[in-house]
Amino acid sequence: MKIIQICGTNGVGKTTLVKGLLSSGNFTKFNIEVDGVSREWWYDGSTAVIGKYNDRNCCGVDAGNYSVDGLIDTIKAVICQNKPDCVLFEDVRMGTSYAFKDKLLRTAYVVGYEFNVLALIASLECSCNRVMERTGNPGANFDAMRGKARAVINTSKRIGEQGAKVFFIDTEKNSKAAVLNALRRLTNG
């Protein structure tokens, strides 16, 4: 049983990947109340996906304005209620934080799950172009995105040294179908 964090900078394809998983399966949307806040999640009987997914640009747990503790409490509630084989979520903000990944690793251990990180990467130019295509805003901050990309890679490697399983996938060099198949293998394996 696994908890999977899908992380990466803006424009690497996190939301595209999760929306692809949701649309290719038999997922049903649910709400769960955690600490007085209603949180969206999706479930197909085996895999639980936490986060908001609609036609917005900002999806996942970033769209739900989750705090670290709020996300961890939601993961625990979904596990307690349904015992899914896999719980996954995608984010930008928490994907750059080693402290958050460490807290998730410890939480996974406590609830009897394995913690996996699926870090999506692409060149800075590719990521910025995708963001500009999506938002129409040509003012992508290359320095900020470069810093986030480094943080995603470095924190992912570091948490791997602590016992998490870490996988890097280049979404620029691999097709959407190949990336989706890699996620399916990870959720089923």
Where are these regions (language model features)?
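Small-molecule kinase domains that catalyze NTP-dependent phosphoryl transfer to phosphate-bearing small molecules
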Residues: N137-A178
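Switch I (effector-binding) loop of TRAFAC-class P-loop GTPase G-domains
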Residues: G25-D44
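Conserved glycine(s) of the Walker
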Residues: G13
